[in-house]
């Protein structure tokens, strides 16, 4: 797992990351990752209910609840780190 994490740090552009994810994941897995990321952004940046997010995205409420738990309660804070860093990058421009 550690080696995979290091490999995921190697792309220097979004295009390079897209190529790596395309090689590494099935199309369904990439869609699932993209859906979870979209849900995390919606949960962080809006006051939509889980039902409204489900209606807007088609993502299951089970997945929405899981993303919300990892975004707000779990100690890993991977979603939070990525969201905050993207905001910092945007502010720096």
Where is each model-derived feature located?
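Short alpha-helical "recognition helix" segments of helix-turn-helix
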Residues: 51-58, 64
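DNA major-groove recognition helix of helix-turn-helix
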Residues: 68-71
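Intrinsically disordered, low-complexity basic tails/linkers immediately adjacent to helix-turn-helix/homeobox/MYB/SANT
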Residues: 77-93
């Amino acid at each position: 797992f550690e080696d995979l994490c290091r490999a995921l740090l190697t792309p220097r552009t979004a295009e390079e990351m897209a190529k790596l994810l395309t090689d590494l994941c099935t199309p369904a897995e990439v869609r699932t990752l993209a859906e979870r990321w979209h849900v995390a952004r919606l949960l962080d940046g809006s006051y939509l209910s889980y039902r409204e997010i489900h209606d807007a995205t088609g993502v299951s409420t089970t997945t929405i609840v899981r993303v919300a738990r990892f975004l707000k309660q779990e100690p890993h804070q991977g979603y939070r780190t990525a969201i905050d860093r993207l905001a910092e990058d945007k502010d720096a421009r």
